Amino acid sequence: MSPRSALTRLVAAALTLLLGACTDIPTSGPVTEVTVSAEGRGVQIAPEPPQKGMSASRIVEGFLQAMADPTSDYEVARQYLSSSVRGQWAPRRATVVYDGWVEAAGDGLELRGTTRGTVDAVGRFTVSRESLTHDFGLVQEAGEWRVSAPPEGVLLSSYIFARSYDSARSYFIARSGQAVVPEPLHLPASEITPGRIVEAQLAGPGTFLSSGVRNAIPAGTRLGAAGAVVDSSGVVTVALEGVPQGLGDVERRELGAQLLWSLSSIPKVSGLHLVVDGRPYPLPGQNDKQVLELSSQQDYQPLSKAGSADLYGVHEGRAGKLSADTSFIPLTSDGASAEMTAISLDGAFTATVAGSPATVRIGPSGGAPVQVDTGLIRAGSVHFAQGRLWLLGRGSSGEQRLLSVSPQGEVAAIDLSALPGEVMDFSLDASGTRAAVLLGIGGATRFGAASLIEGNRIVGWQEVPLTASQEKELSDAVALDWTGEVNVAVVASAGSGKSVFVVAVDGSEVTDLGPVSASPVQVTALPRPGGDAVAVRAADGTVLLYEQHGTWQQAKTPMTWISYPG
């Protein structure tokens, strides 16, 4: 029997296999895969080896499912391959995530569809929207169908990827100061292990992040034979080799912080015991058991400084905040006018912006502010990051300008010349390293990210195409703000009407928080691990606050500007 005579089956039939019931699908044409949301993450995919007498289509289905299981170097998946390629296949080269189907093509079976992204050998996801065609090269060996043309790496449907892979983070030290900056990783759930995390650390940051961070682990360092293991108390012992002698306190402190924060991606990890060349390695701040505790490293985590979750804003020309019942409470009684306001993440500093050219009043919350004449006209975006105020507007000649202002009133201009378009909205993360940006390019608004280097230059722009459910690309974005370490809230369209989406900065996930009744022109979020404090403002001043159960509550008080701390 030829593969052509086999019934073509949907790639998503992996779900059917999991449930133990296979339904025949006609070969007269492709069947579009139904995109399933990632909310079902955590379903265990347990592929089975090929059985005697399996049809060609069942062999392809089984192989596509088995590629989700890396156990014993993809032992099950290799059993679906012909003997000539079984040992040559390199599944760890990369993972291609796709939406597609399997259909008959000539005398064989082909996978056809569109890629959604690629995960490299380290675990970094890159969005990729390309046409995909793969012929499995079905052959018979001893009367059984086998795949003779496996892919370069692994092919996973979006459905299987969402359920068999999990997320982790590899942290590096911000060039801008004492802070760790995460690089998202996507790994098979069974490989979220201390050893795999340390390997990602040794590989260093990817191209995008590298301009804004540095690796505290010296070049040439290797994972030792003892590897990395976690005990029942949550302490990870990491054995390294090749660490240079004579590292100073600051270098060893950063090495420990970077490693430990990365290992904290694993649930219940609480500490690090480092061994170098077979001997315990002293890390500044470790306890008498030579364990560096995660609780002692909070200063490296910018989000740990989050204070109040109050929503601030401007109502009738005055800065204030909303009470529990969303009534307005002015911040001061001096009657100072304000058009925009911002509060630092820890609540220590407050700023207001008013006038054109814009005047900034900035200083300790509740204290006497200093007044700064910025010279900006049409100021349109303001927020705090790393203890400084960031203000976007235009100069006297109409050119776009981005300024940072210290609480002492010192002003620095930021070089935007490396960006390939005009900034429509801008938000710097809590570490002061990564900028989420909406750029106007060729008449369209593009979402992407860039890095702040040397405190005064935005470089390394990388567009991140965003796709919501049902394969709808986000468009007409108007505003954004960071909701956490790796997620950004974006107001955009996915069809008709505006909605608020929480998107991963690498484009790997897009979550729709639901449409809003008003037409929003601004979004603000409190950057914290939960990422659940989001609010939007409409042009008429209507303010909507996101509720955790998925609805939007309208505030009693209309405002002309809104801002969560940070």
Where would I find each of the regions flagged by the language model?
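Bimodal "functional hotspot" detector
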Residues: 2-4, 8-10, 16, 20-566
